[in-house]
A protein has these predicted regions:
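Active-site and NAD+-binding cores of ADP-ribose-processing enzymes
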Residues: 1-56, 78-81, 85-225
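Contiguous mid-protein beta-loop-alpha structural module that forms a pocket-lining wall or clamp
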Residues: 71-77
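A short, exposed loop/beta-hairpin motif centered on an aromatic-Gly-Thr core
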Residues: 61-65
Length: 225
């Protein structure tokens, strides 16, 4: 709501603007209506052209998460950097606050890092061809598998990630914990910073870790602030 306050003169106008914005958005699916907006948002919006790793262009929503903060920061940082590359007029993106949060799941899942799935590791970790992963996502839904655990492609440490295929997978209606981090993105560096009490934590990524061309997908994934 802070972003809309800058566009109006008072709180009443802000509330009116927020209502108009909410009415213009796609409806929240009934299955996700009980959830906090941080959890329901991925199920609310259509995918980008070409889809995402486990979501085809015509598939239902997928919530993407990671086991560790560093892995989540690498994944999101990559896509923000990709957006910057697709905007030639910008040398850097303004530093913005980001909400990093933890949630709990209770659902049947498959782990692509274990047999027999591990034999197809090259398919699951391809930097730009998502066709095999999207087919698996559809098969998993048909088998009533609620989540897919897999190896991060953007984290140099290859941390664990999870694609949540259904809103029913969440054990709680809201995040368990939230933190605010500041994200700065330039063409040669992605930096995350968090200051808590007297301690500052920083995570930095150089685009070189993603290789030549950074594994460009069919289209840039839209990332929500």
């Amino acid at each position: 709501m802070a972003a809309t306050m800058a566009l109006v003169d008072n709180v009443d106008e802000q509330h009116a603007l927020e209502r108009l914005l909410e009415e213009s958005k796609p409806p929240v699916p009934a299955a996700a209506s009980r959830l906090h907006w941080l959890l329901s948002t991925p199920f609310r919006y259509p995918p980008p052209p070409g889809g995402s790793r486990f979501r085809g262009p015509d598939d239902p929503g997928v919530f993407y998460g990671a086991d560790e903060i560093r892995t989540a920061c690498a994944e999101l940082g990559y896509w923000r950097w990709r957006h910057l590359l697709d905007t030639p007029a910008l040398a850097a993106m303004p530093t913005r606050p980001q909400t990093v949060f933890r949630t709990a799941l209770s659902v049947a899942c498959v782990d692509l890092r274990t047999p027999p799935f591990a034999a197809e590791r090259a398919v699951w970790t391809h930097p730009s061809d998502y066709s095999g992963c999207q087919r698996l996502g559809r098969v998993a839904r048909e088998a009533r598998v609620g989540a897919i655990r897999y190896e991060s492609v953007r984290d140099p440490g290859r941390g664990g990630c999870c694609a949540v295929l259904t809103p029913a997978a969440f054990a709680r209606k809201a995040p368990v914990e939230q933190q605010t981090w500041m994200l700065s993105v330039s063409r040669d560096q992605i930096v995350w910073q968090r200051t808590a009490a007297v301690r500052q934590t920083e995570l930095a990524f150089a685009p070189a870790i993603w290789g030549h061309g950074a594994g460009r997908a069919p289209s840039a994934r839209r990332v929500r602030r």
